[in-house]
C-alpha cells in the first residue's frame, strides 16, 4: 500500500469568481524571448461588454 498524502485546502486556487478586469492585464509585465504573440478576433454575444469577451 502506498503512503497517504495530505492535501491542504489553502494551497492552490481559491473558490469564487473574480472580476475579470482584475486578472487580465498586468501593466508591469516584461516580455521574454520565449513569449509568443497571438491575435484573435472576438465578437461578444449580446449583453456582454467587449472587454469581457476578449
Swiss-Prot record:
Residues 1-2 form a propeptide. Its EC number is 4.1.1.39. GO terms for biological process: photorespiration; reductive pentose-phosphate cycle. It is an enzyme of class 4 (lyase). Keywords: Acetylation, Calvin cycle, Carbon dioxide fixation, Chloroplast, Lyase, Methylation, Monooxygenase, Oxidoreductase, Photorespiration, Photosynthesis, Plastid. Gene3D superfamilies: RuBisCO large subunit, N-terminal domain. The modification N6,N6,N6-trimethyllysine is found at residue 14. It catalyses: 2 (2R)-3-phosphoglycerate + 2 H(+) = D-ribulose 1,5-bisphosphate + CO2 + H2O; D-ribulose 1,5-bisphosphate + O2 = 2-phosphoglycolate + (2R)-3-phosphoglycerate + 2 H(+). The modification N-acetylproline is found at residue 3. InterPro entries: RuBisCO, RuBisCO_lsu_fd_N, RuBisCO_lsu_N_sf. One of its GO terms (molecular function) is ribulose-bisphosphate carboxylase activity. Pfam families: RuBisCO_large_N. GO terms for cellular component: chloroplast. It is found in: Plastid, Chloroplast. RuBisCO catalyzes two reactions: the carboxylation of D-ribulose 1,5-bisphosphate, the primary event in carbon dioxide fixation, as well as the oxidative fragmentation of the pentose substrate in the photorespiration process. Both reactions occur simultaneously and in competition at the same active site. Heterohexadecamer of 8 large chains and 8 small chains. Belongs to the RuBisCO large chain family. Type I subfamily. The basic functional RuBisCO is composed of a large chain homodimer in a 'head-to-tail' conformation. In form I RuBisCO this homodimer is arranged in a barrel-like tetramer with the small subunits forming a tetrameric 'cap' on each end of the 'barrel'. This is Ribulose bisphosphate carboxylase large chain. It comes from Icacina mannii.
Amino acid at each position: 500500500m502506498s503512503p497517504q498524502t495530505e492535501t491542504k485546502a489553502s494551497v492552490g486556487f481559491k473558490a469564487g469568481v473574480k472580476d475579470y478586469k482584475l486578472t487580465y492585464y498586468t501593466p508591469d509585465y516584461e516580455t521574454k524571448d520565449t513569449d509568443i504573440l497571438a491575435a484573435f478576433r472576438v465578437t461578444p454575444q449580446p449583453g456582454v461588454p467587449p472587454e469581457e469577451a476578449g
